[in-house]
Amino acid sequence: MDYHSPYFFGYVLGLVHLLGIIAALHAVFTVRTAQGAIAWAMSLFFIPYFTLIPYLVFGARSFNAYIKARRQANQEMHVAMANLNWRPWVEEALTARESQSYAALRAMPKLGRMPCLANNQVKLLIDGRATFDAIFAAIEQAREVVLVQFFIIHNDTIGKALQQLLLRKAADGVKVFVLYDRVGSHALPASYSQSLRDAGVQIHAFATRRGWFNRFQVNFRNHRKIVVVDGVTGFIGGHNVGDEYLGGNPHLSPWRDTHVQIGGPVLACLQESFAEDWYWATRQLPPLILPDAYPDNGVLCQALASGPADPQETCSLFFIEAIHSATRRVWITSPYFIPDEAVFAALRLAVLRGVDVRILIPARPDHRIVYAASSLFAFEAVRAGVRMFRYQPGFLHQKVVLVDDEVSAIGSANLDNRSFRLNFEITLLTVDRDFADQVETMLTTDFEQAREITPEDSSKTHRIQQLGMRIARLISPIL
């Protein structure tokens, strides 16, 4: 074949355009938003030589292979859990239905795949030292099974400390399962995992590149942070395993984040979420533990697991429902503020209802493009009457929602499109006045250390910066 022939060049162009048409049809059927589908389809149809590769990397919005794996995992879990004593767990689910505060969140029972459960114990863990001290202490006490899942695991001081602890527990005969995201933990050396594997720890990466079309995908990421010890103690929140979460990065220090320690029936839901992800990675199920009884008092909790395999956009709908349910206040903290149109409309409507709407975001960037897009959305929110604040001491990474006087949510989900539609996330919804008071105290302290964004801040921004913000917003759906 003459590669210098003009016919060869024409064949290549024709092939690229054919692939562009196929990809455009794929976008029409799979991209969840009309705007996204139109943008991808038009660009793939007319300029596929510029957009075909980006679409392979960033374009897919559904994760059908995971849906099939979840279905198979659920079938195997039903068999594996048939001999477990579910009666106490069911009783806690029935008790939770009597809560008037939870009833105000009218869509939540059907929105989440997991029910609200009564009689849980929750403890607020503010910042990295408290979080990792509690996690390490719980793992030290493990006797049967330890489940560990993080988006990022670094081979640094805290990462090596976790590794050594898990090695000791494996030597004691404890079954240890570790799951990390392949993209988030791309810098983790193979030797880290291999040393754990050699000691009997089962460790795997969560990767989304199964099948030919998905092999280029880095868009779907497992952003969940879950630790469950012996089915009786669990943790969920915003921390990953890295020294920066303990203030080890001078540019971002002090790092501000929040986790929750959990006990009670809701841990069965955390185990279910872990089991589904583990099954995707290994086609096996980890052991699941249910206690024979639960305490007679505690708080209402619902684990809200969300991701691109859901039939609807669970994470986005949660934020919308939480904002719509607010009658007095809704306070939100998130490192990234890139709301979709529905969430932004919910925020504006809450302001018009007289709700105290406050959102706390970082004053320092960890990703400059995301920071630029967040800044533009923040200016628009201020013009709509939302009170926007920038946290001054260091980088703010916590993901917290406080609604009125009883409802709070803490987890891994950010207020951005990636959490809404692309990432696997998990959030703990808690309905309890005392715990909400603790969250209020924590957030009040954070707001006191923040500077409120004013309308004048937008006018003081240089036009070049404004242009950069608007360009960043154009690509915000894939940030």
UniProtKB/Swiss-Prot annotation:
<keyword id="KW-0444">Lipid biosynthesis</keyword>
<comment type="function">
    <text>Catalyzes the reversible phosphatidyl group transfer from one phosphatidylglycerol molecule to another to form cardiolipin (CL) (diphosphatidylglycerol) and glycerol.</text>
</comment>
<keyword id="KW-0812">Transmembrane</keyword>
<dbReference type="Pfam" id="PF13091">
    <property type="entry name" value="PLDc_2"/>
</dbReference>
<keyword id="KW-0808">Transferase</keyword>
<comment type="similarity">
    <text>Belongs to the phospholipase D family. Cardiolipin synthase subfamily. ClsA sub-subfamily.</text>
</comment>
<feature type="active site">
    <location>
        <position position="399"/>
    </location>
</feature>
<keyword id="KW-0677">Repeat</keyword>
<feature type="active site">
    <location>
        <position position="404"/>
    </location>
</feature>
<dbReference type="GO" id="GO:0008808">
    <property type="term" value="F:cardiolipin synthase activity"/>
</dbReference>
<protein>
    <recommendedName>
        <fullName>Cardiolipin synthase A</fullName>
        <ecNumber>2.7.8.-</ecNumber>
    </recommendedName>
</protein>
<keyword id="KW-0443">Lipid metabolism</keyword>
<feature type="domain" description="PLD phosphodiesterase 1">
    <location>
        <begin position="218"/>
        <end position="245"/>
    </location>
</feature>
<feature type="domain" description="PLD phosphodiesterase 2">
    <location>
        <begin position="392"/>
        <end position="419"/>
    </location>
</feature>
<keyword id="KW-1003">Cell membrane</keyword>
<feature type="active site">
    <location>
        <position position="225"/>
    </location>
</feature>
<dbReference type="GO" id="GO:0032049">
    <property type="term" value="P:cardiolipin biosynthetic process"/>
</dbReference>
<keyword id="KW-0594">Phospholipid biosynthesis</keyword>
<keyword id="KW-0472">Membrane</keyword>
<feature type="active site">
    <location>
        <position position="230"/>
    </location>
</feature>
<keyword id="KW-1208">Phospholipid metabolism</keyword>
<keyword id="KW-1133">Transmembrane helix</keyword>
<feature type="transmembrane region" description="Helical">
    <location>
        <begin position="38"/>
        <end position="58"/>
    </location>
</feature>
<dbReference type="InterPro" id="IPR025202">
    <property type="entry name" value="PLD-like_dom"/>
</dbReference>
<dbReference type="InterPro" id="IPR022924">
    <property type="entry name" value="Cardiolipin_synthase"/>
</dbReference>
<dbReference type="InterPro" id="IPR030840">
    <property type="entry name" value="CL_synthase_A"/>
</dbReference>
<dbReference type="InterPro" id="IPR001736">
    <property type="entry name" value="PLipase_D/transphosphatidylase"/>
</dbReference>
<feature type="transmembrane region" description="Helical">
    <location>
        <begin position="8"/>
        <end position="28"/>
    </location>
</feature>
<keyword id="KW-0997">Cell inner membrane</keyword>
<feature type="active site">
    <location>
        <position position="223"/>
    </location>
</feature>
<feature type="active site">
    <location>
        <position position="397"/>
    </location>
</feature>
<dbReference type="GO" id="GO:0005886">
    <property type="term" value="C:plasma membrane"/>
</dbReference>
